[in-house]
A protein has these predicted regions:
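A secondary-structure micro-motif
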Residues: 1-17, 21-23, 28-38, 42-185
Length: 186
């Protein structure tokens, strides 16, 4: 049936546009998540003067920007990701980079007008303050430089008993990453 083949081809060629629409919709939805906002403590006058608030008296903590990956290494000891979004599009040094699933992938270390360089979690100098979601035990996630599919959770309490499948999140003690972003699973 010619009509069937035409519809399949038309569908195939529309996938790029459909994907772009879905990315934009996901970004819009992520930017509306309640965890991106914090209520203002009205007892602290300085905070209410400095922070920008919306009509519901809440302040935006995070804002998501979609970015196209234009380069990526994962076989070196110091791996980086390059994205096609820079200072002109709102990106700043030390911003966190996450993947479409919401897991962290690294931190922005260099920004020019239209591109940014991200230090990947697969970088020997990358260290992330982390915790096990189940029992809130804190530790540090690092890469050992060997297997790009495995990160190491170090410096956890000897009393901790991580189990296969446990979720590892960023901890509230991190100076670089917001708390409770997904890192991976044990």
């Amino acid at each position: 049936n010619v009509n069937h083949y035409y519809n399949n081809w038309a569908y195939f060629f529309d996938l790029k546009e459909t994907n772009a629409k879905l990315v934009a919709e996901n970004v819009t939805l992520r930017n509306q998540l309640a965890q991106n906002f914090v209520s203002i403590d009205t007892s602290k006058k300085l905070g209410t003067l400095v922070l920008r608030k919306d009509s519901m008296e809440v302040v935006r903590k995070f804002f998501y920007y979609p970015a196209k990956v234009v380069g990526n290494t994962f076989t070196l000891q110091k791996n980086y990701i390059w994205v096609e979004r820079g200072a002109k599009q709102g990106i700043k040094k030390d911003m966190v980079a996450i993947n479409p699933d919401g897991s962290i992938v690294g931190i922005v270390i260099e920004v020019n007008d239209n591109y940014s360089k991200i230090m990947s979690l697969l970088h020997r100098n990358s260290k992330v303050s982390a915790m096990l979601k189940r029992d809130k035990v804190a530790g540090t996630v690092e890469w050992d430089g060997i297997d790009p599919d495995i990160l190491i959770l170090k410096n956890i309490s000897k009393s901790a008993s991580p189990k296969i499948g446990d979720t590892v999140l960023t901890s509230p003690y991190s100076s670089s990453f917001p708390a409770q972003l997904m890192i991976g699973r044990v």
